[in-house]
From Swiss-Prot:
Composed of six subunits; NqrA, NqrB, NqrC, NqrD, NqrE and NqrF. Its main location: membrane. Signal peptide: none annotated. One of its GO terms (biological process) is sodium ion transport. Belongs to the NqrDE/RnfAE family. GO terms for molecular function: oxidoreductase activity, acting on NAD(P)H, quinone or similar compound as acceptor. Its EC number is 7.2.1.1. This is Na(+)-translocating NADH-quinone reductase subunit E. Pfam families: Rnf-Nqr.
Amino acid sequence: MWLGAYTWLNVFGILLQAAFIQNILLANFLGMCSYLACSTRVSTANGLGMSVALVLTVTGSINWFVHAFITGPKALTWISPSLASVNLGFLELIIFIVVIAAFTQILELLLEKVSRNLYLSLGIFLPLIAVNCAILGGVLFGITRSYPFIPMMIFSLGAGCGWWLAIVILATIKEKLAYSDIPKNLQGMGISFITTGLIAMAFMSLTGIDISKPSAKIQRAPLETEVVENTTNPLKESSSKHQPSISKARTQRRSL
């Protein structure tokens, strides 16, 4: 339930994969609107990225329990075995969005009290975290992959940190581009998309690293075992055929 067939090395692989290899923004293009709009300054991008990472991590963990004990197949058997046939999967998206919206509202109230400047700089994009497709997409990705709780929490953390890292990198580059001589036709969205593509290509350099699969499920393929058996059986048969002739030759040598 908590870790399943995953080892801690696999959990680290899930974190690495969610943050870099399958970045929720650069590989899946989720959350692009706030990514492009709030990346003009590093301070604003850092605050929004931190908020998205926090919301995605917490809501991903909460929604895992929702799926496991309320909306998933046979999820209500913990109440009574007779409820095994009841399936509340049609309510899953609604409950997920309600959980995300509720936690976003709590985060908005906390930021208004703790950091008024960050609250004002984020503006309308802070309450829009509730409908940010990166949040709901990250939760659904983890649920459809049937992660246990700890891998699900780490996946949500990695996806949120990957989005945070991407927007901070773009904001840093944009601050440098403000003092550069950019061609007129590429100013604004044009140079932002080009920069985003280059960042995505840099993240793709880690594609070959794949340690996120559960180690306990790694077994030899059936086809491979059949090939090995077929190649070893003729050797056994040939050795058994030649065994009588070899023993006969040995007895003749001894008699001589």
